[in-house]
């Protein structure tokens, strides 16, 4: 039977490199002569230990992660980190949050359970369509950290310049821009993200944390499983990890290295985004919703200005093999998530379809 792959613009779980999926399919029943699938393998086996260590090393190579940072492969996605971060870092019970979307807001609300969380900047006044000025923030003198969501999946905004945290630890949720471009890890105390947008299958988060932030000194009542030290000391093997997820992430890391690393990946991502934004800026029918200087190269929201026409577009696009273009339920309209694994041809096909739709409507 002839297989037909669609162009999948889902925000997550999202498109994975076809090459990676084919490799995984080939190894599904017999991983490198072991006679079993990685899914069936003991997480304590030599074979799995090699998968885990190789995945970590490849990630370190891609991001140039210094030796004084630990890489943790943790279950629970990004949501679990909303609580883990204050539980591990809120020594003074004070933290500052920059609210640029729904996920930063959820993390902020979670932190309020554990201490005094302050919203020191927000773009909610204009439906999170821009990144607030973060050059002179009212950072709390006793803040344990300053928190951002670096790329906003729902609203399509991105911090292109990191906030001035006035010497405080910067914590960043990079779920939807992870490995989309190079980043200087040393500017952060913690970088973390759910992997299901740009790296692998759902069910896991990667946490990159500076060693001095990993201590026994967590908030009273912190569950054992949510202590970073437990996972760091056990090399992400405190309990059975998401072993197949780690294997798939490892495959994606190798694929990214093969593409030329994150410098090359960034160039390709910018090229894809430019094709879509250039069309949106010249279109009579479609409009982008984000302030130009704050646009994400990963998530591109757009509207026609007519809800019925939006719905018609999404339906007809799906019939044309361009799927998951419906915007998040909180904002409506459309959104094209054009992660690393989205080929250039997919973005070109979307723009051609949009032009055709514009002519007919």
PLM feature segments, named:
Residues 12, 111, 122-178:
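Active-site phosphate-binding strand-loop segment of PLP-dependent enzymes
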Residues 5-56:
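A glycine-/small-polar-enriched, mobile loop at the entrance of the PLP active site in fold-type I
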Residues 79-144:
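PLP-dependent aminotransferase-like
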Residues 171, 185-196, 205:
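Conserved active-site segment immediately N-terminal to the catalytic lysine
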Residues 17, 195-277, 291, 360-361:
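Active-site C-terminal subdomain of aminotransferase-like
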Residues 34-81, 88, 102, 110:
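Conserved N-terminal alpha-helix of the aminotransferase class I/II PLP-enzyme fold
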Residues 286-317:
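Conserved PLP-binding catalytic core of the aspartate aminotransferase-like
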Residues 1-6, 319, 328, 332-361:
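PLP-dependent enzyme catalytic core of the Aspartate aminotransferase-like
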């Amino acid at each position: 039977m002839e297989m037909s792959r669609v162009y999948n613009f889902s925000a997550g779980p999202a498109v994975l490199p076809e090459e990676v999926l084919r490799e995984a399919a080939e190894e599904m029943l017999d991983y490198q002569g072991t006679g079993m699938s990685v899914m069936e393998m003991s997480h304590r086996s030599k074979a799995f230990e090699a998968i885990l260590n190789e995945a970590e090393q490849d990630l370190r190579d891609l991001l140039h992660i210094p030796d004084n940072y630990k890489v943790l492969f943790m279950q629970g996605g990004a949501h679990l980190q909303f609580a883990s971060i204050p539980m591990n870092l809120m020594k003074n019970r004070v933290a500052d949050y920059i609210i640029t979307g729904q996920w930063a807001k959820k993390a902020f609300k979670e932190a309020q359970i554990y201490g005094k969380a302050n919203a020191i900047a927000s773009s909610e006044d204009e439906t999170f369509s821009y990144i607030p000025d973060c050059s002179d923030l009212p950072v709390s003198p006793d803040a344990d950290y300053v928190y951002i969501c670096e790329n906003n999946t729902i609203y399509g905004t991105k911090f292109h310049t990191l906030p001035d945290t006035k010497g405080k630890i910067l914590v960043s949720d990079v779920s939807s821009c992870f490995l989309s471009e190079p980043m200087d890890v040393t500017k952060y105390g913690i970088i973390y993200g759910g992997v299901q947008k740009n790296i692998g299958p759902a069910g896991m988060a990667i946490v990159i944390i500076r060693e001095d932030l990993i201590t026994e000194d967590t908030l009273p009542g912190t569950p054992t499983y949510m202590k970073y030290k437990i996972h760091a000391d056990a090399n992400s093997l405190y309990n059975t990890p998401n072993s197949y997820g780690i294997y798939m992430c490892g495959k994606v890391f190798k694929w990214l290295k093969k593409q030329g690393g994150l410098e090359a990946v960034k160039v390709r991502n910018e090229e894809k985004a430019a094709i879509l934004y250039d069309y949106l800026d010249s279109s009579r029918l479609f409009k982008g919703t984000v302030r130009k200087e704050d646009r994400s190269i990963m998530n591109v929201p757009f509207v026609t200005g007519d809800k019925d026409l939006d719905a018609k577009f999404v339906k007809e696009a799906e019939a044309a093999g361009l799927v998951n273009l419906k915007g998040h339920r909180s904002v409506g309209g459309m959104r094209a998530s054009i992660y690393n694994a989205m080929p250039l041809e997919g973005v070109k096909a979307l723009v051609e379809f949009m032009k055709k739709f514009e002519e007919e409507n």
